[in-house]
Curated annotation (Swiss-Prot):
Enzyme Commission no: 3.1.26.11
Keyword Transmembrane helix: no
Binding site for Zn(2+) 1: 63, 65, 143, 213
Known partners and oligomeric status: Homodimer.
Organism this protein belongs to: Lactococcus lactis subsp. lactis (strain IL1403) (Streptococcus lactis)
Any one GO molecular-function label of the UniProt entry: 3'-tRNA processing endoribonuclease activity
Protein name: Ribonuclease Z
Keywords: Endonuclease, Hydrolase, Metal-binding, Nuclease, tRNA processing, Zinc
Length: 307
């Protein structure tokens, strides 16, 4: 699992930072990419990456401020230009109003999509998705409008198969190995091969928390609890706490406080005000690291493997 930042700015695009969009790449786990927010020009940012729009199967919108949604109509339309045999439906999660925004933009512009969008409008906290390998939880953050944070939980994966031990026990390599890997007891030439004897302990799944705009809050701590990675906004430097509170945002140290209280492993800071460029970005990093050492301020196109 990898994360890539397509836009890391706050409020409006700048020469160095586009508006908010984050790609959670789950190609090895499920051959999919999940997109979190879709600010203006997200599709242009994607052109500078290896991301294929058809691989984006889910979009999670944190809130309806323009710097988080103005790229949606364009991206959704361009995604429709793929060949018909590559079309896949898309799941779109977000606050109440996201469906009206998207459908109105498509209708007024005369845009027709070659795939279906399944809308999931969220008005309360809870689990919004679950399958055999992942689940997603959401809760309400403390911003100036209704705003969500998302907690992506990978379920524990089955442990490694000890192929050498199976061979030494007399089982030839082949389809029977696959059955044991699936947890099936296998009989072969009078011998019983029990999966519990040949499969190691389950591997703990990863936890990734991606928050929308927010003041420091207990909800943010709960969503991030024990996460391998927390993505938190840091619109302002540490000494601008009053301004951050007034505008529904966080400072570097407040974001780091959340990470520390939640026991997070890695903290990545985004949603950076355009006032912070050059050496000032280093100042933001140092401020946060005084509270949570494993912290970094990301820039557009920054990519990192999780865990």
């Amino acid at each position: 699992m990898e994360i890539q930042f397509l836009g890391t700015g706050a409020g409006q695009p700048s020469k160095s930072r586009n508006t908010q969009a984050i790609a959670l790449k789950m190609l090895d786990e499920r051959n999919e990419i999940w997109l979190f927010d879709c600010g203006e020009a997200t599709q242009h940012q994607i052109l500078n990456t290896t991301i294929k729009p058809r691989k984006i199967t889910k979009i999670f919108i944190t809130h309806l401020h323009g710097d988080h949604i103005f790229g949606l109509p364009g991206f959704l339309s361009s995604r429709s230009f793929q060949s018909s045999d590559e079309q896949t439906d898309l799941e779109l999660y977000g606050p109440v109003g996201i469906k009206d925004f998207v459908l109105t933009a498509l209708r007024i512009s005369g845009s027709r999509l070659a795939y279906r969008i399944n809308f999931h409008e969220i008005d309360s906290a809870g689990k919004i998705f679950e399958d055999d390998s992942f689940e997603v939880h959401t809760d309400l953050l403390d911003h100036t409008i209704f705003c969500l944070g998302y907690r992506v939980v990978e379920k524990n994966r089955i442990g490694e198969l000890d192929a050498n031990a199976l061979k030494e026990a007399g089982l030839p390599f082949g389809p029977l190995f696959g059955k044991i890997k699936k947890g099936e007891i296998v009989q072969y030439e009078g011998k019983t091969f029990d999966p519990k004897d040949y499969i190691g302990a389950d591997k703990a799944g990863k936890i990734v928390t991606i928050l929308g705009d927010t003041r420091k809050s207990n909800v943010a701590v709960r969503l991030a609890y024990g996460a391998d990675l927390l993505v938190h906004e840091a619109t302002y430097e540490a000494n601008e706490s009053k301004m951050a509170k007034a505008h529904g945002h966080s400072t570097t140290k407040q974001a780091a406080d959340v990470a520390k209280e939640a026991g997070v492993n890695r903290l990545l800071l985004t949603h950076i005000s355009a006032r912070y460029v050059g050496p000032l970005v280093g100042q933001l990093v140092r401020e946060a690291q005084t509270v949570h050492s494993n912290t970094f301020v990301v820039k557009d196109f920054y990519e990192e493997k999780i865990g």
